[in-house]
């Protein structure tokens, strides 16, 4: 089997634009008629004025495919990945921008391989470990109004079947590490107290701060919130300095989580080996793809760390994350962010029910685009 062509599609998302304002899909075609589906994570595309802002991303996909993909056997995933990873000007030290291109291509290749074998991808990577995947919700707006309101929202999520959620007690996002005042820490503690009073120990609650705290502020926050038994403390400091994150981890019993901004097994290995985090939030669409994610999960497994993949993306990469989760023994929980288009763009939607995701059983990614829906949103 040979890869003959790669086509891209830009699809406009629907409000509230979960995963970005636009989705960038790939179709990898073969001489045997099998087509693999991939997706290039577009990052902060909700800030884009139009799809034309992504022309450079589209060009990079086609440039990479012309050089390393077209004419190759789609089963040679490792070879294709290594050649593309090591042959650009940023030789073996790529940016998040380029690893998301590698991820998009790699996911499409796995979709082809799974379809050719008539097996879901997870069956080709060790087989199904989990029949269902625990998922968590991002707490809706309004939780900062009062501790009582935070408790009401958490209780509603619990009654909907969710066993875990996440919130950022220190918005808005700040461009650099900042001090958190004692007043802000106290307000956050009251929010967590309100949640615990409402749901008891029936729901896990994660702290997500987007890496915007100084080291000492992160330690103060952790000490103040420990009594409420948070699920994790996500990116307490920026992932740029692994040693500082490890210092936070050493000063708290709250598990530290990180990974959505890290790429390849090399960056993750340092975080894991230095004890900077014990919950690894890799992003399949950005870290290098499904096989690279499986390698990262294996490194984490050797240190008794768990994976809780990041999912702020379009529906194709969400499907790829589900394939990884299903075959990973150290899977903990999956972020579950879905907008209206995620639920209608496939002929058979991904199944999210009662706080769990049910892995698809079809070949490859187990999904098929509904082209009527795609064409209604197609912009390029």
What name fits each language-model region?
Residues 132, 136, 140-251:
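Metal-dependent enolase-superfamily TIM-barrel catalytic cores that perform enediolate-based chemistry
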Residues 340, 345-380:
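C-terminal extensions of enzymes
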Residues 3, 33, 65, 105, ...:
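Conserved, mostly hydrophobic/aromatic
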Residues 96, 106-143:
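Glycine-rich, aromatic-flanked loop segments that form ligand/cofactor-binding clefts
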Residues 29-116:
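Metal- or metallocofactor-binding catalytic centers and their adjacent structured scaffolds
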Residues 1-37, 41-48, 339-343:
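Structured beta-strand/loop patches that form or line metal/cofactor-binding pockets in enzymes
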Residues 29, 63, 93, 223, ...:
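Shared catalytic-loop signature of beta/alpha-barrel
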